[in-house]
Amino acid sequence: MRQLPGKAAKETRKMKRERKQQNKEGHNRVVTVAIPVCLAVFVMLIVYVYSATSKH
């Protein structure tokens, strides 16, 4: 069992399961929110640079 920081008690199975569930939810949130936002910003930057440097 994992030692909790600053505490004498060790992590129980229930606490471990909850921690793993929270980590999984955090990872899913990154995949569904952060990556698409980063891609959108990157695409907007490419479009801006292309339009600023093109010779219309």
UniProtKB/Swiss-Prot annotation:
It is found in: Membrane. Keywords: Coiled coil, Membrane, Transmembrane, Transmembrane helix. It is a single-pass membrane protein. GO terms for cellular component: membrane. The keyword RNA-binding does not apply. The chain crosses the membrane at residues 30-50. The keyword Transmembrane applies. Its main location: membrane. Residues 1-27 are annotated as: Disordered. It comes from the Eukaryota. Belongs to the SMCO4 family. This is Single-pass membrane and coiled-coil domain-containing protein 4 homolog.
